[in-house]
Protein backbone atom coordinates (compact mmCIF):
# COMPACT_ATOMS: atom_id res chain seq x y z
CA UNK A 1 0.00 0.00 0.00
CA UNK A 2 2.84 2.39 0.87
CA UNK A 3 4.41 1.87 -2.56
CA UNK A 4 1.09 2.59 -4.25
CA UNK A 5 0.70 5.78 -2.22
CA UNK A 6 4.19 6.95 -3.22
CA UNK A 7 3.44 6.41 -6.91
CA UNK A 8 0.13 8.23 -6.62
CA UNK A 9 1.73 11.14 -4.80
CA UNK A 10 4.35 11.45 -7.53
CA UNK A 11 1.57 11.51 -10.11
CA UNK A 12 -0.33 14.16 -8.16
CA UNK A 13 2.76 16.33 -7.88
CA UNK A 14 3.48 15.94 -11.60
CA UNK A 15 -0.12 16.86 -12.41
CA UNK A 16 0.30 20.19 -10.67
CA UNK A 17 3.82 21.18 -11.69
CA UNK A 18 3.34 19.99 -15.27
CA UNK A 19 0.17 22.02 -15.90
CA UNK A 20 0.22 24.81 -18.51
CA UNK A 21 1.49 28.03 -16.98
CA UNK A 22 2.63 26.30 -13.79
CA UNK A 23 6.17 25.33 -14.64
CA UNK A 24 7.64 27.75 -12.10
CA UNK A 25 5.67 26.33 -9.19
CA UNK A 26 7.47 24.90 -6.21
CA UNK A 27 6.67 21.42 -4.96
CA UNK A 28 3.15 21.48 -3.44
CA UNK A 29 2.28 20.62 0.14
CA UNK A 30 0.95 17.11 -0.47
CA UNK A 31 1.21 14.38 2.13
CA UNK A 32 0.55 10.67 2.09
CA UNK A 33 -1.15 11.02 5.47
CA UNK A 34 -3.71 13.52 4.17
CA UNK A 35 -4.37 11.46 1.05
CA UNK A 36 -4.85 8.30 3.14
CA UNK A 37 -7.16 10.18 5.52
CA UNK A 38 -9.52 11.11 2.69
CA UNK A 39 -9.55 7.53 1.38
CA UNK A 40 -10.28 6.11 4.83
CA UNK A 41 -13.10 8.60 5.38
CA UNK A 42 -14.82 8.18 2.02
CA UNK A 43 -14.62 4.38 2.16
CA UNK A 44 -15.82 4.11 5.76
CA UNK A 45 -18.99 2.16 6.55
CA UNK A 46 -20.82 5.34 7.56
CA UNK A 47 -20.70 6.46 3.91
CA UNK A 48 -22.66 3.30 3.00
CA UNK A 49 -20.89 2.68 -0.30
CA UNK A 50 -21.64 6.18 -1.70
CA UNK A 51 -24.54 5.15 -3.93
CA UNK A 52 -26.46 8.03 -5.55
CA UNK A 53 -29.89 8.59 -4.10
CA UNK A 54 -29.01 7.19 -0.67
CA UNK A 55 -27.89 8.59 2.68
CA UNK A 56 -24.37 7.75 1.53
CA UNK A 57 -24.72 10.29 -1.27
CA UNK A 58 -25.66 13.04 1.18
CA UNK A 59 -22.69 12.28 3.45
CA UNK A 60 -20.28 12.14 0.53
CA UNK A 61 -21.45 15.39 -1.01
CA UNK A 62 -21.40 17.17 2.35
CA UNK A 63 -17.85 15.95 2.97
CA UNK A 64 -16.58 17.09 -0.43
CA UNK A 65 -18.19 20.52 -0.15
CA UNK A 66 -16.79 20.97 3.37
CA UNK A 67 -13.27 20.00 2.24
CA UNK A 68 -13.37 22.34 -0.76
CA UNK A 69 -14.58 25.18 1.47
CA UNK A 70 -11.85 24.40 4.00
CA UNK A 71 -9.30 24.90 1.22
CA UNK A 72 -10.80 28.29 0.38
CA UNK A 73 -11.93 27.30 -3.12
CA UNK A 74 -14.79 29.06 -4.86
CA UNK A 75 -18.03 27.36 -5.94
CA UNK A 76 -17.71 25.97 -9.46
CA UNK A 77 -21.34 26.37 -10.54
CA UNK A 78 -22.18 30.03 -10.05
CA UNK A 79 -22.69 30.48 -6.33
CA UNK A 80 -23.09 26.76 -5.69
CA UNK A 81 -20.70 23.87 -5.25
CA UNK A 82 -23.38 21.53 -6.62
CA UNK A 83 -24.48 20.80 -10.17
CA UNK A 84 -27.69 18.78 -10.10
CA UNK A 85 -27.93 16.02 -12.71
CA UNK A 86 -31.52 15.00 -13.58
CA UNK A 87 -31.83 11.23 -13.38
CA UNK A 88 -34.55 8.64 -13.48
CA UNK A 89 -34.65 5.64 -11.17
CA UNK A 90 -36.05 2.42 -12.62
CA UNK A 91 -36.59 -0.60 -10.38
CA UNK A 92 -37.45 -3.92 -12.00
CA UNK A 93 -39.80 -6.22 -10.13
CA UNK A 94 -38.43 -9.44 -8.66
CA UNK A 95 -40.80 -11.39 -10.92
CA UNK A 96 -38.75 -10.49 -14.01
CA UNK A 97 -38.89 -13.40 -16.44
CA UNK A 98 -36.57 -14.57 -19.24
CA UNK A 99 -36.76 -17.73 -21.33
CA UNK A 100 -33.99 -18.62 -23.78
CA UNK A 101 -34.91 -21.51 -26.01
CA UNK A 102 -36.63 -24.06 -23.79
CA UNK A 103 -34.90 -22.91 -20.59
CA UNK A 104 -36.77 -20.71 -18.12
CA UNK A 105 -34.04 -18.80 -16.28
CA UNK A 106 -34.03 -17.86 -12.61
CA UNK A 107 -33.80 -14.14 -11.89
CA UNK A 108 -30.49 -13.21 -10.24
CA UNK A 109 -29.29 -16.82 -10.12
CA UNK A 110 -29.09 -17.39 -13.89
CA UNK A 111 -29.71 -13.93 -15.30
CA UNK A 112 -30.39 -10.30 -14.58
CA UNK A 113 -32.54 -8.22 -16.92
CA UNK A 114 -33.83 -4.67 -17.00
CA UNK A 115 -35.04 -2.04 -19.42
CA UNK A 116 -33.96 1.55 -19.88
CA UNK A 117 -37.29 2.40 -21.48
CA UNK A 118 -39.44 4.49 -19.16
CA UNK A 119 -42.47 2.23 -19.20
CA UNK A 120 -44.29 0.45 -16.36
CA UNK A 121 -44.28 -2.90 -18.18
CA UNK A 122 -42.41 -4.35 -21.13
CA UNK A 123 -42.01 -7.70 -22.83
CA UNK A 124 -40.36 -9.51 -25.72
CA UNK A 125 -41.97 -12.58 -27.28
CA UNK A 126 -40.46 -15.18 -29.60
CA UNK A 127 -37.48 -12.99 -30.50
CA UNK A 128 -34.92 -14.91 -32.62
CA UNK A 129 -31.58 -15.28 -30.85
CA UNK A 130 -28.52 -14.19 -32.82
CA UNK A 131 -24.95 -14.68 -31.60
CA UNK A 132 -23.17 -11.47 -32.64
CA UNK A 133 -19.71 -12.21 -31.25
CA UNK A 134 -18.37 -9.20 -29.38
CA UNK A 135 -21.12 -6.99 -30.79
CA UNK A 136 -18.62 -4.51 -32.21
CA UNK A 137 -18.91 -2.15 -35.15
CA UNK A 138 -15.51 -0.45 -35.58
CA UNK A 139 -15.04 0.87 -39.14
CA UNK A 140 -11.58 2.22 -38.31
CA UNK A 141 -10.51 -1.35 -37.49
CA UNK A 142 -12.37 -2.98 -40.36
CA UNK A 143 -14.61 -4.83 -37.90
CA UNK A 144 -18.39 -5.32 -38.06
CA UNK A 145 -20.01 -8.11 -36.06
CA UNK A 146 -23.45 -7.07 -37.30
CA UNK A 147 -22.59 -7.14 -41.01
CA UNK A 148 -25.43 -8.47 -43.13
CA UNK A 149 -27.83 -8.92 -40.20
CA UNK A 150 -31.14 -7.13 -39.71
CA UNK A 151 -31.54 -7.13 -35.93
CA UNK A 152 -35.03 -5.66 -35.81
CA UNK A 153 -37.17 -7.87 -33.58
CA UNK A 154 -34.19 -10.06 -32.68
CA UNK A 155 -32.15 -10.54 -29.52
CA UNK A 156 -28.37 -10.21 -29.61
CA UNK A 157 -26.24 -12.64 -27.58
CA UNK A 158 -22.94 -10.87 -26.94
CA UNK A 159 -19.45 -11.62 -25.63
CA UNK A 160 -17.84 -9.28 -23.11
CA UNK A 161 -14.47 -7.57 -23.77
CA UNK A 162 -12.63 -7.30 -27.13
CA UNK A 163 -11.51 -9.84 -29.75
CA UNK A 164 -7.90 -9.15 -28.78
CA UNK A 165 -8.40 -10.45 -25.25
CA UNK A 166 -9.40 -13.96 -26.31
CA UNK A 167 -6.54 -14.28 -28.81
CA UNK A 168 -3.94 -12.42 -26.72
CA UNK A 169 -2.98 -10.71 -29.97
CA UNK A 170 -1.56 -7.21 -29.28
CA UNK A 171 -2.25 -6.24 -32.91
CA UNK A 172 -5.98 -7.02 -32.59
CA UNK A 173 -7.74 -4.04 -31.03
CA UNK A 174 -5.39 -3.51 -28.05
CA UNK A 175 -4.75 -7.11 -27.17
CA UNK A 176 -5.64 -7.83 -23.56
CA UNK A 177 -6.11 -4.14 -22.78
CA UNK A 178 -9.83 -3.45 -23.08
CA UNK A 179 -11.01 -0.68 -25.39
CA UNK A 180 -14.38 1.03 -25.13
CA UNK A 181 -15.66 -1.55 -27.61
CA UNK A 182 -15.18 -4.16 -24.91
CA UNK A 183 -17.24 -2.44 -22.22
CA UNK A 184 -20.76 -3.55 -21.42
CA UNK A 185 -22.05 0.00 -21.89
CA UNK A 186 -20.91 -0.03 -25.52
CA UNK A 187 -22.42 -3.47 -26.16
CA UNK A 188 -25.91 -2.27 -25.23
CA UNK A 189 -25.49 1.03 -27.07
CA UNK A 190 -24.51 -0.74 -30.29
CA UNK A 191 -27.34 -3.24 -29.99
CA UNK A 192 -29.69 -0.27 -29.73
CA UNK A 193 -28.20 1.32 -32.85
CA UNK A 194 -28.76 -1.97 -34.66
CA UNK A 195 -32.44 -1.95 -33.68
CA UNK A 196 -32.28 -5.10 -31.54
CA UNK A 197 -35.33 -5.99 -29.47
CA UNK A 198 -33.12 -7.54 -26.81
CA UNK A 199 -29.43 -7.58 -25.86
CA UNK A 200 -27.92 -10.22 -23.57
CA UNK A 201 -24.25 -10.28 -22.55
CA UNK A 202 -22.56 -13.55 -21.55
CA UNK A 203 -20.79 -13.14 -18.22
CA UNK A 204 -17.36 -14.77 -18.38
CA UNK A 205 -15.43 -13.83 -15.24
CA UNK A 206 -11.99 -13.80 -16.88
CA UNK A 207 -12.59 -11.23 -19.65
CA UNK A 208 -15.14 -9.37 -17.52
CA UNK A 209 -12.65 -9.09 -14.63
CA UNK A 210 -15.38 -9.33 -11.98
CA UNK A 211 -17.51 -12.18 -10.57
CA UNK A 212 -21.21 -12.84 -11.04
CA UNK A 213 -22.10 -11.36 -7.65
CA UNK A 214 -20.84 -8.00 -8.91
CA UNK A 215 -23.33 -8.26 -11.75
CA UNK A 216 -26.06 -9.25 -9.28
CA UNK A 217 -25.38 -6.30 -7.01
CA UNK A 218 -25.01 -3.79 -9.82
CA UNK A 219 -28.39 -4.61 -11.35
CA UNK A 220 -30.35 -5.46 -8.23
CA UNK A 221 -32.67 -2.73 -7.05
CA UNK A 222 -32.95 0.80 -8.49
CA UNK A 223 -31.10 1.54 -11.74
CA UNK A 224 -30.21 5.13 -12.55
CA UNK A 225 -30.21 6.74 -15.96
CA UNK A 226 -30.23 10.16 -17.56
CA UNK A 227 -33.60 11.67 -18.38
CA UNK A 228 -34.07 11.35 -22.15
CA UNK A 229 -36.70 13.27 -24.11
CA UNK A 230 -37.92 10.09 -25.83
CA UNK A 231 -38.01 8.04 -22.65
CA UNK A 232 -35.16 5.89 -24.02
CA UNK A 233 -37.54 4.44 -26.61
CA UNK A 234 -34.57 3.63 -28.85
CA UNK A 235 -33.01 1.20 -26.40
CA UNK A 236 -33.63 -2.57 -26.62
CA UNK A 237 -36.82 -3.60 -24.84
CA UNK A 238 -34.81 -5.93 -22.61
CA UNK A 239 -31.12 -5.75 -21.70
CA UNK A 240 -29.27 -8.08 -19.39
CA UNK A 241 -26.62 -10.64 -18.50
CA UNK A 242 -26.62 -14.43 -18.32
CA UNK A 243 -24.13 -16.65 -16.51
CA UNK A 244 -21.53 -18.61 -18.45
CA UNK A 245 -23.10 -22.02 -17.58
CA UNK A 246 -26.45 -20.83 -18.95
CA UNK A 247 -24.74 -19.54 -22.10
CA UNK A 248 -22.97 -22.87 -22.56
CA UNK A 249 -26.31 -24.69 -22.34
CA UNK A 250 -27.90 -22.30 -24.83
CA UNK A 251 -25.08 -22.64 -27.35
CA UNK A 252 -24.92 -26.43 -26.94
CA UNK A 253 -28.64 -26.64 -27.73
CA UNK A 254 -27.85 -24.74 -30.94
CA UNK A 255 -25.08 -27.17 -31.88
CA UNK A 256 -22.18 -24.97 -30.82
CA UNK A 257 -19.62 -24.78 -28.05
CA UNK A 258 -18.80 -21.61 -26.14
CA UNK A 259 -15.05 -21.87 -26.69
CA UNK A 260 -15.59 -22.62 -30.37
CA UNK A 261 -17.69 -19.49 -30.88
CA UNK A 262 -15.41 -17.36 -28.71
CA UNK A 263 -12.42 -18.17 -30.93
CA UNK A 264 -14.44 -17.77 -34.14
CA UNK A 265 -15.76 -14.39 -33.00
CA UNK A 266 -12.23 -13.22 -32.21
CA UNK A 267 -11.03 -13.56 -35.81
CA UNK A 268 -11.43 -10.95 -38.56
CA UNK A 269 -14.31 -11.69 -40.90
CA UNK A 270 -16.58 -13.24 -38.26
CA UNK A 271 -20.26 -13.25 -39.18
CA UNK A 272 -23.20 -13.40 -36.79
CA UNK A 273 -24.84 -16.79 -36.24
CA UNK A 274 -28.56 -17.53 -36.02
CA UNK A 275 -28.91 -19.76 -32.96
CA UNK A 276 -32.23 -21.18 -34.21
CA UNK A 277 -33.81 -20.49 -30.82
CA UNK A 278 -36.00 -17.74 -29.44
CA UNK A 279 -36.14 -15.45 -26.43
CA UNK A 280 -39.17 -14.35 -24.46
CA UNK A 281 -39.13 -12.13 -21.41
CA UNK A 282 -41.11 -9.63 -19.40
CA UNK A 283 -40.66 -7.30 -16.48
CA UNK A 284 -42.47 -4.61 -14.53
CA UNK A 285 -40.92 -1.33 -13.43
CA UNK A 286 -41.32 1.22 -10.68
CA UNK A 287 -40.21 4.61 -12.02
CA UNK A 288 -39.09 7.64 -9.99
CA UNK A 289 -37.52 10.89 -11.21
CA UNK A 290 -34.89 12.57 -9.09
CA UNK A 291 -31.45 14.18 -9.30
CA UNK A 292 -27.93 13.59 -8.03
CA UNK A 293 -25.20 16.23 -7.73
CA UNK A 294 -21.80 16.68 -9.23
CA UNK A 295 -19.59 18.63 -6.83
CA UNK A 296 -17.63 21.50 -8.39
CA UNK A 297 -15.00 23.81 -6.93
CA UNK A 298 -12.72 26.31 -8.61
CA UNK A 299 -9.44 28.11 -8.04
CA UNK A 300 -9.52 31.28 -10.21
CA UNK A 301 -6.62 31.84 -12.58
CA UNK A 302 -4.31 34.79 -12.05
CA UNK A 303 -3.87 35.68 -15.74
CA UNK A 304 -6.48 33.82 -17.80
CA UNK A 305 -9.44 33.32 -15.43
CA UNK A 306 -11.81 32.43 -18.29
CA UNK A 307 -9.65 29.53 -19.43
CA UNK A 308 -9.96 26.30 -17.45
CA UNK A 309 -8.00 23.21 -16.53
CA UNK A 310 -10.36 20.51 -15.24
CA UNK A 311 -9.53 17.63 -12.89
CA UNK A 312 -12.23 14.96 -12.58
CA UNK A 313 -13.00 11.86 -10.53
CA UNK A 314 -16.30 10.13 -9.82
CA UNK A 315 -17.39 10.03 -6.19
CA UNK A 316 -20.05 7.31 -6.42
CA UNK A 317 -19.80 3.58 -5.79
CA UNK A 318 -22.20 0.61 -5.52
CA UNK A 319 -23.74 1.16 -2.09
CA UNK A 320 -25.14 -1.93 -0.38
CA UNK A 321 -26.13 -5.33 -1.72
CA UNK A 322 -29.43 -6.98 -0.92
CA UNK A 323 -27.95 -10.37 -1.84
CA UNK A 324 -25.76 -10.61 1.26
CA UNK A 325 -26.47 -10.46 4.99
CA UNK A 326 -24.07 -9.10 7.57
CA UNK A 327 -21.39 -6.88 6.05
CA UNK A 328 -23.20 -5.86 2.87
CA UNK A 329 -21.49 -2.54 2.13
CA UNK A 330 -19.36 -2.09 -0.98
CA UNK A 331 -16.97 0.47 0.48
CA UNK A 332 -15.26 1.38 -2.79
CA UNK A 333 -11.84 2.33 -1.43
CA UNK A 334 -10.12 1.75 -4.78
CA UNK A 335 -13.16 2.53 -6.93
CA UNK A 336 -13.15 5.41 -6.47
CA UNK A 337 -12.28 6.83 -3.07
CA UNK A 338 -8.68 6.89 -4.30
CA UNK A 339 -9.57 9.07 -7.28
CA UNK A 340 -11.83 11.39 -5.29
CA UNK A 341 -9.19 11.70 -2.59
CA UNK A 342 -6.66 12.46 -5.31
CA UNK A 343 -8.91 15.28 -6.47
CA UNK A 344 -8.94 16.77 -2.97
CA UNK A 345 -5.19 16.31 -2.62
CA UNK A 346 -4.48 17.98 -5.97
CA UNK A 347 -6.68 20.89 -4.87
CA UNK A 348 -4.70 21.13 -1.64
CA UNK A 349 -1.48 21.26 -3.64
CA UNK A 350 -2.69 24.09 -5.84
CA UNK A 351 -3.90 26.13 -2.86
CA UNK A 352 -0.64 25.63 -0.96
CA UNK A 353 1.61 26.55 -3.91
CA UNK A 354 3.28 29.97 -3.63
CA UNK A 355 2.63 30.84 -7.26
CA UNK A 356 -1.00 30.60 -8.31
CA UNK A 357 -2.02 29.08 -11.64
CA UNK A 358 -2.46 31.40 -14.63
CA UNK A 359 -5.61 29.56 -15.70
CA UNK A 360 -8.58 28.70 -13.53
CA UNK A 361 -8.54 25.16 -12.18
CA UNK A 362 -11.83 23.30 -11.77
CA UNK A 363 -12.14 20.30 -9.45
CA UNK A 364 -15.11 18.19 -10.53
CA UNK A 365 -16.37 15.20 -8.53
CA UNK A 366 -18.90 13.39 -10.70
CA UNK A 367 -21.94 11.28 -9.88
CA UNK A 368 -23.40 8.14 -11.46
CA UNK A 369 -20.27 6.70 -13.09
CA UNK A 370 -21.10 3.28 -11.70
CA UNK A 371 -24.47 3.50 -13.43
CA UNK A 372 -22.76 3.84 -16.81
CA UNK A 373 -23.62 7.52 -17.20
CA UNK A 374 -20.04 8.81 -17.37
For the regions a protein language model found, what residue spans apply to each?
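Extracellular/luminal Protease-associated
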Residues: 23, 31, 108-230, 235-238, ...
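Structural recognition of the beta-strand scaffold that forms the well-ordered cores
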Residues: 40-43, 129-132, 155-159, 198-202, ...
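Acidic/histidine-rich catalytic neighborhood of metal-dependent amide-processing enzymes
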Residues: 176, 180-182, 207, 319, ...
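N-terminal hydrophobic or amphipathic helices/low-complexity stretches enriched
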Residues: 19-76, 246, 253, 300
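Soluble metallo-hydrolase cores and metallopeptidase-like ectodomains found primarily
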Residues: 101, 107-148, 230-332, 348-355
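Bacterial N-terminal signal peptides
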Residues: 9-18
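Noncatalytic luminal/extracellular "stalk/propeptide" segments of secretory-pathway proteins
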Residues: 48-170, 273-276, 282-283, 287, ...
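Bacterial N-terminal signal peptides that target proteins for export
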Residues: 1-8
Amino acid sequence: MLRIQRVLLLCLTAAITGCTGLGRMQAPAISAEEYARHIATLSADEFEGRKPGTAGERKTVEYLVAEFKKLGLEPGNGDSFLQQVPIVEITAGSDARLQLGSAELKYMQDMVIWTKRLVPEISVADSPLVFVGHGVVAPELGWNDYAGVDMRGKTAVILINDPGFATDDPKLFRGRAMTYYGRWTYKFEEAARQGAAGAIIIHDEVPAAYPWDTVQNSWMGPQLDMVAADGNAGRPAIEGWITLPIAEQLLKASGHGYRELLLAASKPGFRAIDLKQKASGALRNAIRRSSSPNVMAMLPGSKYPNEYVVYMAHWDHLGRTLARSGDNIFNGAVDNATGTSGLLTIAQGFVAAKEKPERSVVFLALTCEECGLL
